[in-house]
């Protein structure tokens, strides 16, 4: 099984928009359709399709200037299609996403936010080196990786 990150294109965007989360996760994340629209209208967003071999299986969205701060990248969305969760796809995709962001010449910080009661997400992000720094104004947990 080969996991890769690819551009969102005319050929894959419908498959990405059709992906679903289980009922208990739906209130924790915007839809892929919403995220793809955001990326279309705001050029700081970078949408990425997660592929398993030649099949789209998930979606990620990050920005290049979190809250207007150059060098601060924020991972805004990260999801694997519900039937394919818990198979290692998300772990490999997150490794690739973090590596892609770290390869940017100006990066000094990567952050991610999640619902504080989503303990599974918290443990997942901590396993990549994210450190929780507190609750933001939207009542979400903020975690970050400082690089410089």
Which residues are covered by each model-predicted region?
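Acetyl-CoA-dependent GNAT
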Residues: 3, 7-83, 100, 134-137
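Short glycine-rich hinge loops at helix-strand junctions in the catalytic core
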Residues: 88, 105-106, 129
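Terminal substrate-recognition subdomain of acyl/acetyltransferases
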Residues: 141-148
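Active-site acidic-Proline motif in GNAT/NAT acetyltransferases
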Residues: 81-83, 87, 116-117
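Conserved acetyl-CoA pyrophosphate-binding loop and the N-cap/start of the following alpha-helix
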Residues: 84, 88-96
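Conserved beta-strand-loop-alpha-helix junction that forms the acyl-donor binding cleft
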Residues: 111-121, 138-141
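Conserved active-site alpha-helix within GNAT-family acetyltransferase domains
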Residues: 91, 116-134
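Conserved GNAT acetyl-CoA-binding A-motif
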Residues: 101-113
């Amino acid at each position: 099984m080969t996991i890769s990150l690819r551009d969102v294109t005319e050929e894959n965007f419908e498959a990405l928009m059709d992906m679903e989360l289980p009922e208990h996760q739906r209130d924790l994340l915007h839809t892929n359709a919403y995220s793809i629209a955001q990326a279309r209208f705001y050029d700081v967003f970078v949408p990425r399709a997660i592929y398993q071999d030649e099949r789209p299986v998930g979606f990620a969205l990050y920005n290049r200037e979190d809250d207007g701060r150059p060098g601060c990248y924020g991972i805004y969305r990260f999801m694997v299609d519900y039937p394919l969760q818990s198979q290692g796809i998300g772990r490999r995709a997150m490794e690739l996403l973090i590596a892609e962001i770290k390869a940017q010449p100006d990066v000094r910080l990567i952050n991610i936010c999640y619902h504080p009661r989503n303990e599974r997400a918290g443990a997942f992000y901590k396993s990549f080196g994210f450190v929780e720094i507190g609750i933001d104004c939207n009542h979400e947990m903020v975690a970050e990786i400082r690089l410089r």
